[in-house]
């Protein structure tokens, strides 16, 4: 199983540290890279603008995807050097950097020849755990080399780490790193030739297609109308976490909390209940949140947005980049019945997947003032389901690598929730503003949700009454 935690909680085993940095020659080539006509994706543009705005206000925004895993023995530096450089040269998401040429316009620069990209190893002497954590958290999205790779060599094993700007990747990078760095490295040190990989897709091509698709949208487009209707039912924007979160005008660092919802047997019984209701496990996840919110707030309709991967074609599935989109979900829960909630939640999720290709930012651009639409406010709620019991994530989750994912614990304005299904248990991880009011609210939400999972799995969930 892999774990999700904050970077400040990571205390690696003592050892010598070797980090791969962009070479001076590669940095010079990047600075000279010509302007590209390829636009940033909507995800990238939103991220860059948020980062710039946070910096202007003196705030430190989360911006990285950080991973570690352990391997036995001593690291073969030559083999690891090959694996890392091959990965960076293979994927065009690493070949660009961005700058603002005026208040809003973002310009992309692209290195023409992937062979010009090179990272070289450097040993860091006498670095403490705190210094290492700071070092790993340094990449920022307005630099080309917004990625770091390295190892910590202990007596009988080494820990590999990767710190990559979210600008370049999304959660699917987990499987990519496992194959292209871990498995490639293992093949090389085992005396085998480099793993043969199919041609990678181009994220640039996705950005061009996305720009053309979103440029063709109007307020009359069906996908836009559905977003407008969803936002109108949530005070003109995306849904807010239903319980108090404290004063969010004051910046708070993010706090991460993980709780077990069900063991393996309970998870199997819960899935059977979902299927009996005409849903899948994912529908049951949103149903439990909806019923928990009904218990806590007496609401009769549950609204939330969830993340999903928008890769669809075989080429896109081989493309590294930021493809994550949002799906709006609405679940009526007046009946208080799990079966009906799960069934409707599944329908809402499945029928809303095509909306993930329409960024909410684009809807805001198209919206007329009379629609009353506005950007998400602090405290918005994003809920995701991650199934690590099936491929490709099961390969990582079931390995003996001690695979870990880290959040930086920087300023957090929203509540992000991940329900994670593993082979032997189901957990929930929540990232939220670190203050006493938000902590109490999140704890109450998790407790209510866990109770519904357990009662559903045990077949003891009767019709729920508000406030019970």
Curated annotation (Swiss-Prot):
Question: Gene3D superfamilies annotated for this entry?
Answer: Chloramphenicol acetyltransferase-like domain, Nonribosomal peptide synthetase, condensation domain
Q: What keywords sit in the KW lines?
A: Acyltransferase, Cell wall biogenesis/degradation, Lipid biosynthesis, Lipid metabolism, Transferase
SUPFAM superfamilies (alphabetical): CoA-dependent acyltransferases (SSF52777)
Looking at the record's lineage, which domain of life comes first? Bacteria
InterPro entries for the chain: CAT-like_dom_sf, Condensatn
Q: What is this protein's function?
A: Required for the biosynthesis of sulfolipid-1 (SL-1), a major mycobacterial cell wall lipid. Catalyzes the acylation of trehalose-2-sulfate by adding the palmitoyl group at the 2'-position to yield the intermediate trehalose-2-sulfate-2'-palmitate (SL659).
Give its E.C. classification number: 2.3.1.288
Gene Ontology molecular-function annotations: acyltransferase activity, transferring groups other than amino-acyl groups
Catalyses which reaction?
A: 2-O-sulfo-alpha,alpha-trehalose + hexadecanoyl-CoA = 2-O-sulfo-2'-O-hexadecanoyl-alpha,alpha-trehalose + CoA
Enzyme type, top EC level: transferase
Effect in UniProt of substituting residue 166 to A: Loss of sulfolipid-1 (SL-1) production
Q: Which GO terms describe its biological process?
A: cell wall organization; sulfolipid biosynthetic process
Which family does the record assign? Belongs to the PapA acyltransferase family.
Q: Which species does the entry assign this protein to?
A: Mycobacterium tuberculosis (strain ATCC 25618 / H37Rv)
Designated name of the protein: Trehalose-2-sulfate acyltransferase PapA2
Null allele phenotype:
Null mutant does not produce SL-1. Disruption of the gene does not alter the virulence of M.tuberculosis in mice.
